[in-house]
A protein has these predicted regions:
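Class II aminoacyl-tRNA synthetase catalytic cores and aaRS-like
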Residues: 1-326
Length: 326
């Protein structure tokens, strides 16, 4: 389980630390910090280019989520993670920031906090790329403890609190990024073929375009019963009637039916229509959409799912007529 009721003592300790910060005049959620660099950019520039123990004069200011803390007396080590999972080590030394600041660091910083570090880029004695801090600040004080990063979350937590899954599982974060890449790729391909993107009504007086049970609502202004759309088809076809010869929409649809791992009550649908086309032309378009999306997201026509299943979308696709399929 995860949440305040599951870890009351940890939450209370974090709330107390936030109170300490406020009493000391330290903002637990500062409006601005001098973040001049990203963890990804520092990694890209220096990773593998410094010898163990080598120091540079390059100053950086970066922030990330605290995933690891180690207290070694006059020196503390912290691991910061960027949103994409890129990590970097921070080193906070009494010699560099002073005894009072180091004491405050040990008192206030917890796993899950977002931490700002400003300092020099170095390689530790073990060769780990690090930021040797001259300044530090809590960018956002976390009141909830992190989930156990080495354990799988239960399905209920993953479903009801997807943000927890994103923290715990890099694959889930990557899925969100890949979805964004896929949608952008679809739009580029449609645009290359002169399709116009439109947004059609979500609230409709008639639920058509598919056979599904709709969600219902009521518009008070017109005293009118309405449906959340189950498909955009009817309004897209009206665009064709109006003279838009190639039209598409990427948007949400709603169906008040069964829910399982592959069916959600609200979901994104891609739908397109083309005047003067044939089933051959739309088939070629679908193939191109899938192949280009695979390349843009994975860099290959071969796609491996999380369960290990592999699909190869490359080359020519086999075709079969509707008559032969029956």
């Amino acid at each position: 389980e995860f949440g305040p009721l599951a870890h009351p003592e940890q939450v209370q300790m974090r709330v107390a630390k936030r109170a300490m910060m406020l009493e000391a005049g330290i903002a637990p959620y500062p409006v601005h910090l001098d973040v001049t660099d990203t963890i990804e950019a520092v990694r890209a520039k220096y990773d593998g280019k410094l010898e163990a123990g080598e120091e540079t004069e390059a100053m950086v200011g970066l922030a990330g989520r605290v995933l690891f803390l180690r207290n070694a007396g006059g020196l503390c080590f912290v691991q910061l993670s960027a949103g994409d999972g890129t990590k970097i080590q921070g080193m906070i030394s009494k010699k560099e920031i002073g005894a009072d600041s180091l004491k405050q660091f040990k008192q206030l910083v917890d796993l899950g906090d977002h931490l700002y570090l400003k300092g020099r880029v170095i390689a530790s004695k073990t060769g780990e790329l690090s930021v040797f801090a001259t300044e530090w600040a809590i960018a956002s004080k976390a009141l909830q403890p992190l989930p156990a990063l080495h354990k799988d979350l239960n399905e209920d937590t993953r479903t009801r609190k997807p943000y927890i899954g994103m923290i715990a599982d890099e694959n889930i974060r990557n899925m969100a990024r890949n979805r964004s890449k896929a949608v952008a790729s679809l739009r580029r391909t449609f645009d290359d073929h002169d399709f116009l993107e439109v947004e059609t009504p979500m609230l409709q007086t008639l639920h058509g375009g598919a056979a599904a049970r709709p969600f219902t609502t009521h518009m008070n202004a017109f005293d009118l019963d309405l449906y959340l759309r189950i498909a955009p088809e009817l309004f897209l076809k009206r665009c064709l009637v109006g003279g838009i010869d190639r039209v598409f929409e990427i948007n949400r649809d709603f169906r008040n039916e069964g829910v399982d791992a592959t069916h959600a009550p609200e979901f994104t649908m891609v739908e397109a229509y083309q005047a003067y086309g044939t089933y051959d032309s739309i088939g070629q378009l679908v193939k191109e959409l899938v192949q280009k999306t695979a390349m843009d997201v994975y860099g290959s026509h071969k796609v491996t799912l999380l369960d290990g299943t592999e699909y190869d979308f490359g080359g020519e696709w086999k075709t079969i007529s509707m008559y032969d399929s029956l």
